[in-house]
Amino acid sequence: MGLDNLKVGLAQMLKGGVIMDVVTPDQAKIAEDAGAVAVMALEKIPSDIRASGGVSRMSDPGLIERVMDSVSIPVMAKVRIGHFAEAQILQSLKVDYIDESEVLSVADSSYHIDKRKFTVPFVCGATNLGEALRRISEGASMIRSKGEAGTGDIAQATKHIRAILSEISALTQAREDELPARARKLGAPIDLVRETARLGRLPVVLFTAGGIATPADSSLVMQLGSDGVFVGSGIFKSEDPKAYAAAIVQATAQYDDADLLARVSRNLGQAMPGVSNLDVRFSNRGV
C-alpha cells in the first residue's frame, strides 16, 4: 500500500465518529471517556478565536504534547492555511492528523500546503466539490465541510454538505465526454473528477464541521450524508460538557434512531450561546 493510500486508510478509521476540540488534557479525557474517536488540541476553541480576533496561529507544542500524553485516542492539531513550517513542526511532534484550517489566520493567500510531502494525514475544509477535489489533489486524506466554526449555528454546515453531495450526484449522472468540461468548471483534476463520478462519493472521508451544538445537529448532518462530525465550541461552551459530549457521540452513531435522539437530548442543560450575525466568515478563507 502506498503512503497516500495508507493516509486515506487512517482517516477512514474515524468514520462514523465525533472529533472534539479540546484546550486542556482534562477536556481531552472528557472527550475520550464520552467516546470521541479523536481530539483536536487547541489553545482556544473557535468561539474564543472568533471573539478575541487578531492573528491566530498553531497551538503551543507543549500544549499539544500534554494532550497527546493524556489520551490514547488520536490527536489532531491545526496549522494555518499554507504554513508548511507549522505542519513540519506538528509532524515532528508525531501528531496523528494535521488540520490545515481556515479557523486560524491564513498564512498564504495563494497556496495551500503540499500535503503529499508529509507522512501525517491532513484534514482540509471545503464549501463545495471543486474546493474539496483541489484539496484532495494536494494530498488531503479527509475533507470536512466548513460550516461556520464557533457560532453554534448549523445553517452554513448544512449548506456546505448539501452543496458538496449534490455536486457529486450531478457528476454521477454526467456522460463520460462531459467530465472534462465539468473538471474545468470545478477547477479540479480530471482524474479525481472521474474517480468521484465512478464512486458516487469523494475518494476520502467527508466529515461535517462548524456550528454543530446539539445531538439533533449531529443527527441532521449524518442523515444528509456526512461520514462523521467535528464539534468545536458546542461541547465545552455548553452548560454540561460531559453530558453534551456523550449525547453527541450517541447521536452520531445512531443518527437515524429518533427515540434514542429524544432520550439523549433530555435534561442536557443549556447549549452553547449562538452567533448568527457574522462580521468574519471563516468559511471564505482558503478557497
Swiss-Prot record:
The keyword Lyase applies. Pathway: Cofactor biosynthesis; pyridoxal 5'-phosphate biosynthesis. It catalyses: aldehydo-D-ribose 5-phosphate + D-glyceraldehyde 3-phosphate + L-glutamine = pyridoxal 5'-phosphate + L-glutamate + phosphate + 3 H2O + H(+). InterPro entries: Aldolase_TIM (IPR013785), PdxS/SNZ (IPR001852), PdxS/SNZ_N (IPR033755), RibuloseP-bd_barrel (IPR011060). Keywords: Lyase, Pyridoxal phosphate, Schiff base. D-glyceraldehyde 3-phosphate binds at residue 162. D-ribose 5-phosphate binds at residues 21, 150, 211, 232-233. One of its GO terms (molecular function) is pyridoxal 5'-phosphate synthase (glutamine hydrolysing) activity. It is an enzyme of class 4 (lyase). The active site is at residue 78. It comes from the Bacteria. Belongs to the PdxS/SNZ family. In the presence of PdxT, forms a dodecamer of heterodimers. Catalyzes the formation of pyridoxal 5'-phosphate from ribose 5-phosphate (RBP), glyceraldehyde 3-phosphate (G3P) and ammonia. The ammonia is provided by the PdxT subunit. Can also use ribulose 5-phosphate and dihydroxyacetone phosphate as substrates, resulting from enzyme-catalyzed isomerization of RBP and G3P, respectively. This is Pyridoxal 5'-phosphate synthase subunit PdxS. It comes from Tropheryma whipplei (strain Twist).
